[in-house]
Amino acid sequence: MIQSQTFLNIADNSGARKIMCIRVVGTTYQKYAYIGDIIIAIIKEVVPNTKMEKSEIVRAVVIRTSKEFQRDDGMRIRSDDNAAIIIDQKGNPKGTRVFGPVLQELRQWNFTKIISLAPEVL
């Protein structure tokens, strides 16, 4: 579960390393973001000599959470960290590589580009 003020690792090569969630995109009463949800975040840590800047406001999609995710068949999947991928306004990732596994449920939520870049799909 990702809420406001939560720090997330970045799982792509867009230039940011850590972001902090400031808002969950969607309804006004939704407090938490889960896997596949879009958040608005601030970049807190960047890789040197990249286009991204610290304190820049970006949109990101959550791909891994420490809180377990339960599939329809009852299987629960949990990750070691909270991770996200920075996206543009159209939903395409800004990076060209994705690090770490992603869930196959992202395909249902129209993030097929992220699925195709991922090295492992669970």
Curated annotation (Swiss-Prot):
SUPFAM superfamilies: Ribosomal protein L14 (SSF50193). It comes from the Eukaryota. The keyword Membrane does not apply. GO terms for biological process: translation. GO terms for cellular component: chloroplast; cytosolic large ribosomal subunit. Part of the 50S ribosomal subunit. This is Large ribosomal subunit protein uL14c. It comes from Gnetum parvifolium (Small-leaved jointfir). The lineage of its organism: Eukaryota, Viridiplantae, Streptophyta, Embryophyta, Tracheophyta. The gene is rpl14.
